[in-house]
Amino acid sequence: MTTKKYTAAELIELEEKYGAHNYHPLPVVLERGEGVFVWDVNGKRYFDFLSAYSAVNQGHCHPKIVAALCEQAHKLCLTSRAFYNDCLGPYEKMATEYFGYDKLLPMNSGAEAVETALKLARRWGYKVKGIPENEALIIVAEGNFHGRTITIVTMSSDPDSYGQYGPFTPGFVSIPYDDTEALKKVLDEKGDKVCAMIVEPIQGEAGVYVPHKGYIKECYDLCHAHNVLFIADEVQTGIGRTGRLFACDHEGVRPDMITIGKALSGGTLPVSAVLADDEVMLTIGPGEHGSTFGGFPLAAKVAVAALEVIRDEHLTENAARLGVIFREEIAKIDSPYFKSVRGKGLLNAVVTEPQNGIEAWDICLKLAKKGLLAKPTHRHIIRFAPPLVITEKQLREAIGIIKDVFESL
């Protein structure tokens, strides 16, 4: 039996005909990846400057991670948490020691990790802080992106995320991002019923919005002054992406809870987790939260390998060094379509000046033709986030492509 070889156009048409229309991809059909590169079905090579929204920090198909995946897949994939397995405990030990927390609660997607953190925060609020049941509040920031579930879109200020999905989950207070005075006002007025604040140290989907220096520390201090948990959503910013293990590390902040995902598996499986100390984590007991796949042997084995790659190959340090080069060089672009560049480490964004009918989407199409893949967020911002394994030589080649495209518009 022979397998039909589809053309790129046919593959796009298959998705259009048989798949839900909840994404608007660039018209590129990929079939292979290695390191910082991906290849389409026609054999064309591209720099990957999206990294699956920072899930592929270790590069595509990293041999160590793939080897761990294949070895465990031949041995045991799934048991559920009804039984112990020989992979989860070693993973939890390695991860908690590496990240510096008492406990890890394994989940699958980033949204699941966030939902888990919200449940833990409310449980802590009732059992430890003494908030009257069903009255706990959680503070969120405008412009956030924490996931797509009903509860999480309740927290969103983006109509595309929450429009016509109501009614929404109560118990959230939204304040402007990067505004500690707004946080102080809410805590002064309602702090006795606030169990937590959840925030992204850098807002990725909002356009790699980097808050003012000291913002995260100010939020942390205000929360602790009111006996409120500080939760950092590091699903996109964590695991080396910003040039530190966690983006919060730039300000010396150790959150009460951290959500992680994406690069936790090196882009091979949906693997996420919540990190917290015993006071928070042990408020949930057996049967009170769980996941069939959370912590399954395959995920545990892959996560250990993925974290070892980050640590042993010094990818965090590489992100810090090359991020400076990227921003310095991109800032030199001479084009009326270029406005500014911002970011930390290898999580960066270019703010464009749409004009003459050319927006960020059109620029991304031109970048793809030149062999570099990036994706716009909103109409005027392009996120650039290559795998952290990128070399300086590769980075400078990619910068050349970006400069050429902007300066030829």
Pin down the residues of each PLM region:
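Conserved N-terminal phosphate-binding loop of PLP-dependent enzymes in the Aspartate aminotransferase
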Residues: M1-L409
